[in-house]
Regions:
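Short beta-strand scaffold segments in enzyme catalytic cores
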Residues: 57, 159-163, 172, 291-294
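Conserved phosphate-binding/catalytic loop of the ribokinase/pfkB sugar-kinase fold
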Residues: 97, 151-154, 160-204, 209
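Conserved phosphate/ATP/ADP-binding segment of small-molecule kinases
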Residues: 216-302
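Short beta->alpha connector loops
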Residues: 74, 209-213, 233-237
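A glycine-rich helix N-cap at a beta->alpha junction
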Residues: 84, 88-98, 149-153
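Conserved post-catalytic alpha-helical subdomain immediately downstream of the catalytic base
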Residues: 61, 274, 278-285, 304-373
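Glycine-rich phosphate/adenosyl-contacting loop at the front of the ribokinase-like
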Residues: 1-87, 103-112, 126, 135, ...
Length: 373
């Protein structure tokens, strides 16, 4: 209880993350297997993954209230993803397509589209601690059994097979990406509740280029409430080619190659100019351990990530984008100037670098929990 003269606690900033949710099965290996080879992993972890999902987890770890809009569905895999998200403090708007065989909890007409995260008190309780322990791989056997027992089409969720090389932290990923069909209706219902004043509006909206039908609803909501929209552009996706021009800030990887008059663009400055010409007000290009580059409003800059001994780089880009969203939450389009964007990129680089020092996409949160702007 607050002391009589103490001010009420400030509300956590809200971030809406629209895109992809998958199941990441992560193996730590001495070296990737050769063709027709079998190897024994050094460690294993299973966690919910996907660009928007990992960004939402990062936003929550940094003290924000994260809401993820993604198709999850029903079945053992979906149950596992829900448990992981709840343990990480992420609320879910399940945007899976309804069917008789895989009905989501809010189908057909659940009044409240948000599936709650665990509260801070619950996360500190023994039961939640046991759940988090299993999700972080200490008790991964039960989680792995859920994957192995799931019918192949039970939920439509994709499984990403991820290997991480112990000596370098480099990762390799195989995934079918957005296999589950997306239904925008639950997200539209949330947007209507925001418009009616029944739900808190987001202070920022992030899209990841997957499930463009959800991106369209998220971007429309951002425009209506007057908050920034951020795109994790990752690598180039043909079906998301029109999205960068609809976003205020676009963060792309060094493998984002938009089409140009003479072929694919690869030089960072050419890519940045393409993004700005398309309509973005700020552009960021991440390059792993090399300096992240940013451009906006006639300004530009470079931020060198902290030097760390990388153990696992899986999800570092997603975590960067979640931290970037946390740094920009509450800003408006006119605020995208050099000092603001540069500072947000610098903070995001620090968080992403810290995430690579531990194996898996969850353990790093203990080091930065609650470290907001």
């Amino acid at each position: 209880m607050n002391a009589p003269d103490s001010p009420p606690p400030a509300a956590r900033p809200v971030g809406l993350f629209c895109g992809l949710a998958v199941v990441d099965v992560i193996q730590l290996v001495e070296a990737p297997p050769a063709p027709d080879d079998k190897i024994v992993a050094l460690d294993q972890i299973i966690a919910a993954g996907g660009p928007a999902t990992n960004a939402a987890v990062a936003f929550a770890a940094l003290g924000g209230r994260a809401i993820l809009a993604a198709p999850v569905g029903a079945g053992p895999l979906a149950d596992f993803v829900r448990a992981d998200l709840a343990a990480c403090g992420v609320e879910l708007i399940d945007c899976s397509e309804c069917s008789e065989s895989t009905a989501r909890p809010d189908c057909p007409d659940r009044p409240d589209c948000l599936e709650p995260a665990l509260t801070a008190d619950a996360v500190d309780s023994a039961g939640a601690a046991d759940a988090v322990e299993g999700l972080d791989g200490v008790n991964a056997v039960s989680a792995m059994s859920a994957v192995s027992s799931a019918a192949p089409m039970a939920s439509g969720l994709s499984i990403s097979s991820c290997t991480v090389t112990a000596a370098t932290g480099q990762r390799s990923v195989v995934s079918t990406n957005a296999r589950a069909g997306a239904d925008p209706a639950p997200l539209e219902r949330y947007a209507s509740q925001v418009a009616a004043g029944r739900k808190s509006p987001p202070g920022i909206v992030l899209i990841d280029g997957h499930n463009p039908v959800l991106a369209a609803v998220g971007l429309d909501l951002a425009a209506r409430v007057g908050v920034l929209s951020v795109m994790d552009a990752g690598s180039w996706k043909d079906d998301a080619a029109n999205l960068p021009g609809c976003c205020d800030v676009v963060a792309a990887s060094a493998r984002f190659y938009p089409p140009g008059p003479s072929g694919l663009m690869a030089a960072p400055e050419d890519v940045a100019h393409w993004l700005l010409d398309a309509g973005a007000h700020g552009a960021v290009i991440t390059r792993g351990a090399d300096p992240a580059l940013w451009w906006c409003a006639g300004a530009r800059g470079a931020v060198a990530p902290p030097r760390v001994e990388a153990v696992d780089t899986l999800g570092a880009g997603d975590i960067f984008h979640g931290a970037l969203a946390r740094g920009l939450v509450g800003a408006r389009r006119g605020d995208i100037v050099g000092p603001v964007l540069g500072a947000a990129v610098e903070r995001a680089c620090a968080v992403a670098a810290a995430s690579t020092e531990l194996f898996g996409t969850r353990a790093w949160r203990q080091r930065v929990r609650g470290r907001g702007n």
